[in-house]
C-alpha cells in the first residue's frame, strides 16, 4: 500500500525543525530576498526564535506595537538577558494575518528592508503568534556574529 500522506502542520504547531509553518515560510521569504541581492542566507538561531515568539506574544498580551517592550525592554536587552552575543543586531515587527502580507509590508519599508538585506547579519529568529488586532504578530530578530 502507498504510504499515507503526511499532514501539513497547522501554522501554530512547531514542526520537526522546531519552527511553525508560518515561521519557516517567513524565513524562506527573507532568504529568497537575500539571494536575489547576492547575499548569503541567514541561519536559524532557535534562541532568537524563542525571543521573537516571546516578543510577539508580549505585544498581543499587552496590546502594543513597539520595539520597546514594557515587559522585556529593547530587543537588545532581551538578547543580552538570554546570553546571546552579537556584533550587530536588529529587529523587524509586523502585524498582518498572512506571511505574504507581513513580508510585503516589511519589504516596502526602507528600514525593515535594510534589516532583511543587511550583509552583516548572519542569523535570524522569527516568532509568529496568532491573535491580536492584526490577526498575527510577526517578530524578526537578526544578529551578526
Feature locations, PLM:
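Loop/turn elements at helix/coil->beta-strand transitions in domains of secreted/extracellular proteins
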Residues: 35-37, 84, 89, 121-124, ...
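N-terminal targeting leaders of exported, membrane, and organelle-targeted proteins
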Residues: 1-54, 64, 129-145
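Short, surface-exposed glycine/acidic/tryptophan-bearing loops
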Residues: 49-99, 103, 116-118
Amino acid at each position: 500500500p502507498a504510504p499515507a500522506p503526511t499532514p501539513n502542520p497547522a501554522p501554530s504547531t512547531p514542526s520537526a525543525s522546531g519552527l511553525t509553518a508560518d515561521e519557516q515560510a517567513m524565513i524562506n521569504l527573507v532568504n529568497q530576498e537575500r539571494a536575489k541581492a547576492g547575499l548569503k542566507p541567514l541561519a536559524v538561531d532557535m534562541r532568537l526564535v524563542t525571543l521573537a515568539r516571546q516578543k510577539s506574544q508580549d505585544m498581543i498580551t499587552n496590546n502594543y506595537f513597539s520595539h520597546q517592550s514594557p515587559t522585556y525592554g529593547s530587543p537588545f536587552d532581551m538578547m543580552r538577558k538570554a546570553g546571546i552575543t552579537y556584533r550587530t543586531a536588529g529587529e523587524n515587527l509586523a502585524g498582518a494575518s498572512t506571511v505574504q502580507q507581513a513580508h510585503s509590508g516589511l519589504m516596502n519599508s526602507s528600514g525593515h528592508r535594510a534589516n532583511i538585506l543587511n550583509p552583516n547579519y548572519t542569523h535570524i529568529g522569527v516568532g509568529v503568534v496568532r491573535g491580536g488586532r492584526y490577526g498575527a504578530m510577526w517578530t524578526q530578530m537578526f544578529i551578526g556574529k
